[in-house]
Regions:
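Short hydrophobic alpha-helical runs that function as membrane-insertion/retention elements
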Residues: 140, 237-240, 264-269
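C-terminal helix of von Willebrand factor
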Residues: 257-287
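VWA/integrin I-like adhesion module and closely mimicked acidic/polar interface patches used
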Residues: 209-260
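Short beta-strand-loop
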Residues: 138-168, 187-193, 217-218, 247-259, ...
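Arginine/glycine-rich "motif VI" loop of SF2 helicases in the C-terminal RecA-like domain
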Residues: 130-134, 193, 228-236
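Short hinge/gating elements
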Residues: 38-53, 106-111, 147-150, 164-167
């Protein structure tokens, strides 16, 4: 039997910390720091000029002058000005903030209705959507229940659309986690093909009670196989948000999933910034 739960109270999210990498990206936003070839962002160092193309080079003059001075030798006639050569040229190494693609993969199975887990999970998703709006992220929304996952929203900048899908999302049926992960990975791969500068974040909200899988496979091994494929790809930062209530009997399946994804695993309450509440006016402005 399906049931539509209300959305729980939203809250301010703690910053999501991503591992730094050396990939140079373009884009705008307010979440993740990334290396960039654009002449924007803060200077964090310098590099020797690659090739001999000076026309569009973002020259770091201070580092260039230091390199020329270190190479310079005082002649017999005394001090002379250093001569800058091509080998002295240094370019700026810059970092800037960009938005991310945040893929929400939400467990909407019947077990999420127990202890009003779905109400709390919806509140967490709304909080994360509000944070995504402020950070200028794109979002995608997948729900898994019954026998398979359903893509409720392809990547978009419209948080309002995601909110509507969240509000209407029913709960019921089995937990096809493997299907949810496979659809998430498909969306991420497609977006990376369209825009290689995308930096994806996968947020899986589940109690981990997996009990449905493709024909011929056991549920948890199928889910772990899908999780390991995402981890092996290496381009996605994943979090498994455990909706099981701490202090109750726990099955620790979410922990097993997080290990397969090589993901962090916060409980919902651990996402909350201390002492920060969301007021109704802020919510109305966003939605």
């Amino acid at each position: 039997m399906e049931q539509v739960f209300a959305i729980g109270d939203p809250f301010t999210i703690k910053p999501i910390r991503l591992r730094k990498d050396r990939v140079q990206r373009k884009g705008t936003g307010r979440r993740s720091r990334t290396a960039t070839l654009q002449k924007a962002g803060r200077t964090v160092g310098s590099l020797p000029l690659v090739g001999s193309e000076m026309k569009y080079a973002d020259i770091a003059w201070d580092a260039t002058l230091r390199a020329a001075a270190l190479r310079h030798r005082v002649g017999e006639g005394g001090w002379t000005r250093p001569v800058i050569t091509l080998e002295d040229i240094r370019t700026r190494r810059r970092e800037k903030k960009i938005g991310n693609l945040i893929v929400f993969s939400v467990d909407a199975s019947g077990s999420m209705g127990a202890a009003r887990r779905m109400e709390e999970a919806k509140g967490a998703v709304l909080s994360l959507l509000m944070d995504a709006y402020q950070k200028r992220d794109k979002v995608a929304f997948i729900a898994f229940r019954g026998q398979q996952a359903e893509v409720l929203l392809e990547p978009t900048g419209s948080v309002e659309q995601a909110y509507r899908r969240l509000k209407e999302l029913p709960t019921g049926g089995r937990t096809p986690l493997a299907s949810g992960l496979e659809e998430s990975h498909r969306i991420i791969r497609n977006q990376l093909r369209k825009d290689p500068d995308t930096r994806p974040i996968l947020l899986v909200l589940s109690d981990g009670r997996v009990n449905a899988a493709p024909d011929g496979m056991k549920p948890m091994p199928a889910a772990l196989e899908a999780a390991r494929r995402i981890a092996a790809d290496g381009r996605t930062h994943s979090l498994v948000i455990d909706v099981e209530r701490q202090g109750l009997v726990q099955f620790a399946m979410a922990k097993t999933l997080s290990e397969g994804l090589e993901a962090d695993m916060p409980f919902i309450r651990e996402l909350k910034a201390h002492g920060a509440q969301v007021d109704a006016a802020s919510l109305k402005d966003i939605l």
